[in-house]
Amino acid sequence: KNEACAWCRMSVSDARFAAQLTAPGREPKFFDDLGCLRDWLKASRESAPWTAWAADHRTKEWSRLANAVVARSAAVQTPMSSGLLAWASAASRDADPDALGAKDVPASELLGPAGGER
């Protein structure tokens, strides 16, 4: 099922770039691009205890964004052009040809000072 991005409203159609926020008792919020999740967290005034998740770009498996390896690629076109990619581990990143030339980004750049959990 293709969810709509909670930030830009585009369809979340490519699992390699997907992200989501979950909180107890709340509907999950889906994002088509890690840049959309970052922008939503910066703008949101919601105080729910959100946990941020990102799809591993290579395996499409969910992992906690706070523990993920994140990088920005100028060569990979992401849905909203952020260039942000995530992997569950450095080993997954190293096995992904799309990671070549990508520059590491600290998760705090996406999650903000609250670490994506509020």
Residue ranges of predicted features:
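Intrinsically disordered, low-complexity linkers and terminal regions
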Residues: 1-30, 34-118
